Structure formats: structure tokens, C-alpha cells
Amino acid sequence: PKKGRETSAPPDPLESLRILRDRALVELLYGTGIRVGELVALDVRDIDLRRAEVRVMGKGRKERVVPLYPGIVERLRFYIREARPLLAAKADQRRAGPRALFLNARGKPLTRQGYWVVLRKAAAASGVAGHVTPHTLRHSFATHLLRGGASLRHVQELLGHATIATTQIYTHLTSDQVHKVFESAHPRA
């Protein structure tokens, strides 16, 4: 290279794999509302891309099926087809390949702590201010469903809550929403 010119380093293939994985991770957590512990416990066989659903083992070993929207299906399909095999190849070859859906850079199952790192980086990169946690995404999922008209019972089922009382935490409606519903629904408003 000529003097005074900086050369850019070639792109790191491992970083590209991580980016694909991280996008799938964040999108899956927000798009399904599952707990971070449930997310990192997913195996490849828990994802059914054809039916657009994920089988989740929740608290108390209770299984539930959560639908996936098309954007998540495509992101997961790409991650599973392109990035995951290369990450899995990094694992110890003397053992059977890992079955975990999400793998770290060494080909081992991603941990809860590893997910926190991913989420912090994603929040910083997208300019999100404040403290973002995996539960922030779960809370956003539930709140957006309720504001979109989903029933409390359906949200309870999707979140894997044992009681409706737990789900009611997400029903904090704004004053404007309450007034709007009142004015549109009450015959004398």
C-alpha cells in the first residue's frame, strides 16, 4: 500500500457468523416472548420452520408451542443453514455435534450470560438508551400483543404463565388508551 493509506483488514468470517446468530437470537426472543433460559435451552429439533413454530420447555417442565412470524422463520432458516454448521464445526470433534440451536464462537451451547452480552451489544449498536434486559424484550412482546388486541388468555398461553394474574402485570394501559376505548365503546360517551 502507498504511504499514508490505511489498509482495511479483511472481514472476520467468525464475526459474520456471530452477526447472523445474534440477529436470530434477538429477533427470536422479542418475536416469541420466551424467557432467556428457554431460549438458550432450545435444540435444533425444537424449531419447525415448515410449520413456523417453536416448541419451548417452560417452567415446571411444561411444554408449549409458540408461533413464529415470517421474518423470524427466514432469519432462523438462514442462521441454521449458513452460520450454525460453521459454528458447530468449531466444537470438539471427538464428541457428537452439539444439538443446541444457538452456539458460541467455540461451537458450544450459548449460555444465559452469553446472551446478555449479545443483547447489550445489539442495544448499543441500535442506539437504544437505557438498560435493556432479556425481560425487556419479553415485556415488549406481551405489551405489543395486548395493545394489538390479543386476549389476556392468549398472551398467558404464549408466555407460559401458570396463572392469569402473572400475565396481568402486562396490562398497564395508558390513560389515552383507556379514554379512547371508553369513548368508542360506551353508549353515552
Q: At which residue positions do the language-model features occur?
A:
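Conserved catalytic core of the tyrosine transesterase superfamily
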Residues: 1-189
